[in-house]
């Protein structure tokens, strides 16, 4: 088939935040769609979603036959992917999975479209391609050009992750708690371990035996797999912040070869998917609300030499976690698939 041949698409989790954004981006980018089948749980079956100005009826995933589907996007949680993604792949669909279920399986590629698109070809082993964690993804879009030029040995990163990373319930919790506090009412935390409104929580996902959280360890495991370099040391701290959309990261790297902040800035200005916002003035840096929300690029600012290490650099990295952190990358993978692989 040619790249312009319309494809049959299944969208698992079509009623969720990532699923809705996937539908929007497929339409925005004129992806060649012959038929789009939105799928969800029995509870959501029968509802409608919008795609390119048309209302599509959501079908029940449990009894859907994937025969004839070319690409199946999965964005409904790990348990759903575990049960249904292999079934879709066995029927001949290429699965692009937005959960963590398959990221650490050796023969399933973990892909950031700007960083390791060559890995997509490895999908033939299992018929599944994994989308990375949103925080890993935006970090590596920015760091990969520097790694190729100077070799990154160590990454220290603190993330500032919006509540949309916890789904609709996270958005609702922040809105509800903020309204309550502004009305001088007491707040009992519901979605997060402590109240999220006007607060910072240094805890995302389950604690591991080594004291790190699973969210933090995802950044370790995924960075090494995507860059195909097990020697890279990654030291993360993941923090939930009272922002609706957009993740930010304070990143410090140590490189094998010396690279100056000026040279790194030039590399990043030429890097696909990156927009440099790095002016030494008030407001001359990217932020989630002003730059990232609702947009596609990974924004990088505060690029500066580390005054404490001869081969160190500091960067500030911001992106929309629902768009580039999940939905956009999945669509970019699909675009590469239809251009050259299926």
Indicate where each model-derived feature is located.
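C-terminal active-site/capping subdomain that shapes the small-molecule cofactor and substrate pocket
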Residues: 233-342
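Oxyanion-binding "anion nests"
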Residues: 197-244
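Short acidic/glycine-rich loop or secondary-structure boundary segments that cap or lie
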Residues: 165-168, 208-211, 243-246, 261-262
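N-terminal Rossmann-like NAD(P) cofactor-binding subdomain of oxidoreductases
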Residues: 1-196, 231-233, 266, 284, ...
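A broad structural signal for alpha-helix termini and local helix breaks/kinks
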Residues: 150, 227-228, 255, 272
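Helix-loop-beta segment of a Rossmann-like dinucleotide-binding subdomain
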Residues: 123-130, 199-210, 315-317
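A short glycine-/small-residue-rich loop at the edge of a beta-strand within enzyme catalytic domains
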Residues: 13, 187, 191, 207-214, ...
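A glycine-rich, Thr/Ser-enriched phosphate-binding loop motif common to dinucleotide/cofactor-binding enzymes
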Residues: 127-138, 211-220, 325-329
